[in-house]
């Protein structure tokens, strides 16, 4: 079936790296199609890289363009409930995202990962281990490189991180294996409630051969599994990929076979043990022999901006967990901590309508000073008696620096999005790392 039959005019909504990847893909693989771009921002990121022969409408919507399109490709940051997109749908014009275009194009095996937390680590590690096992893997999607920019005849396995936003506009992505890691409150400014958010995530299983799900979080299980093989991972409940005692030590197990001791992992924190089990389950389901890649697994230290030690001077650790953009992510970071002295926890930013109170009982058990900043930083103030509000991340670090001593830890794990004061979570983490090195 030729999906492109009758499509002569495509409107791309939202530029940035994803929008640019769509434009570049269309020009390379469908050069006869007319492409127009709409971006409601006055200065869209990426406009300087846009070819001069592609028409760009900035600073608002252009309904005439939209309603004359044969296909609209929308950025995942734009909700389908947006009135202009609703008008397009009402006119019978298909609205898809970049992942759907990728699905139309690719025949090579694909595995994909979604969930509230841990997606990027699982995606990255899956790619690292697949390549170490001799399978040429390309990694991207919601992490790093947009999916359409990955397309190459050399690739033997695509590994995609998919957000709930991307899944909303994806309907035909065939997957060898799909993992749903966990579900916790996030993006409540976009969804009606947790049920809606979960349903968006579950779309990952629509055309998957194997569903890789979390035995410790039954919300990750598909509602309708008739067409699926289901494989489980977990550390609390019985699962096919799990932990068990072996030769007096805790081991990772794959289908009743000991793989390696947890102590041999370089990754820090209990949540990362779960992430590793997920990767083993995914690769096994996709036919990749992960046993050929155990050296790579042992040496893997994780992603930038995810519980990353950026400075360690005079016994004071500075840890960048800027990728913690929701409460569950910050809770995961706190659960794996080993602190000898005082913890200085930096929280705040754009809260996305989240409930921060689940942090309170955990903070009560820690020797913590809570340092709050950002547009929603005030919402953290009632969570702990030590809480103080600051104008900026730099003002926090200037203020606490004189009292830091050996054994202390300064942890940026904000539980919020970054776009009140920073371009993105990477920029936030980079600035924290610079400040850490400056003041350490």
Swiss-Prot record:
Chief subcellular location:
cytoplasm
Per the UniProt entry, the disulfide pairs are none
The question of whether Cell division is a record keyword is answered with: yes
**Keywords on this record?**
ATP-binding, Cell cycle, Cell division, Cell shape, Cell wall biogenesis/degradation, Cytoplasm, Ligase, Nucleotide-binding, Peptidoglycan synthesis
The record's listing under InterPro entries reads: Mur-like_cat_sf, Mur_ligase_C, Mur_ligase_C_dom_sf, Mur_ligase_cen, MurD
The keyword Cell wall biogenesis/degradation is assigned to this record: yes
* A Pfam family reported for this protein in Swiss-Prot or TrEMBL: Mur_ligase_M
GO biological process terms held by the UniProt record: cell division; cell wall organization; peptidoglycan biosynthetic process; regulation of cell shape
Write out the catalysed reaction: UDP-N-acetyl-alpha-D-muramoyl-L-alanine + D-glutamate + ATP = UDP-N-acetyl-alpha-D-muramoyl-L-alanyl-D-glutamate + ADP + phosphate + H(+)
Subcellular localization, as worded in the UniProt entry: Cytoplasm
Q: What family does this belong to?
A: Belongs to the MurCDEF family.
Per its database record, what is this protein's job? Cell wall formation. Catalyzes the addition of glutamate to the nucleotide precursor UDP-N-acetylmuramoyl-L-alanine (UMA).
- Protein's UniProt name: UDP-N-acetylmuramoylalanine--D-glutamate ligase
Source organism per UniProt: Vibrio cholerae serotype O1 (strain ATCC 39541 / Classical Ogawa 395 / O395)
